[in-house]
Design a protein with these regions (language model features):
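Hydrophobic alpha-helical segments at protein termini of multi-pass membrane proteins
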Residues: 1-245
């Protein structure tokens, strides 16, 4: 309902970055475009994932606060690397898998990247609307170049492993399929935790650490998308590269 009270400029500043990234990833899917209904449902599942994550984070925060002082080092490490990271990335992954794992449309390895990024950007879009409604245009502009593409990057890493898991599963290699499904949650959660932990450190020198981390995250994610798009193969199409491993 807060959308009814937001300035159209604020809404545009919030929505446009996510839409831009959605289009870029969609166009990178060179073999076979994904059904629009499926992609829309993934965006909506990303929105729903924010609700699940918020409830888990509230519970986790209350429990953690009863053990450690708020903003102490142990508190922040557990909060960002465990509670926030796994609540958000875990919720995204569960909803992603329930919708796509057995879908007939999931027939190319790069589809995993497309699906995971769409869920992640649905999450980022709704989360961003909430922040911008509270804090205004300056927050929208900052998050447009940090948090929104950050969620997209987490989605790229999730999708790379998710697509590989599907390929291994199709080949009957269930051990590696399970390993990749685990990594599809673990890797983005670790990156997400590092992002939040560095971003909230009060040392002024950490601003440079955060900048380097974000630029490296963006660069590697872009490389993964480009290589994955170029080397994409149909999952049941015989031998082909499992890009990046």
């Amino acid at each position: 309902m807060f959308l009814l009270y937001m300035n159209p400029i604020l809404i545009a500043a919030t929505v446009v970055p996510a839409v831009f990234l959605l289009i870029r990833v969609y166009r990178a899917d060179r073999l076979e475009p994904e059904p629009s209904g499926l992609l829309l449902s993934l965006i909506l599942r990303g929105v729903f994932a924010t609700v699940i994550a918020m409830m888990l984070e509230e519970l986790g925060s209350a429990l953690l606060g009863s053990v450690y002082a708020e903003n102490s080092l142990p508190y922040n490490i557990i909060m960002y690397f465990v509670i926030v990271a796994f609540s958000e990335e875990g919720a995204k992954y569960i909803l992603l898998r329930r919708r796509t794992w057995r879908s007939d449309a999931f027939n190319c390895q790069f589809d995993g990247v497309v699906y995971a990024v769409f869920v992640s950007l649905g999450f980022a879009l709704w989360e961003n609307l909430g922040y911008v409604a509270m804090y205004g245009l300056s927050t929208a502009l900052v998050r447009a170049v940090t948090a929104v593409p950050g969620h997209a990057c987490f989605g790229v890493f999730m999708g790379v492993y998710y697509g590989r898991a599907k390929r291994y599963d199709n080949d009957g290699d269930f051990v590696n399929a399970k390993r990749c499904r685990t990594m599809a949650v673990l890797m983005p959660a670790l990156l997400h935790g590092a992002y939040d932990f560095i971003a909230t450190m009060e040392d002024p020198n950490c601003e440079w650490v955060f900048l380097v981390f974000v630029l490296a995250l963006f660069a590697v994610s872009l490389k993964l998308v480009r290589v994955g798009s170029r080397s994409d193969r149909y999952i049941d199409g015989g031998e082909g590269p499992l890009f990046f491993g």
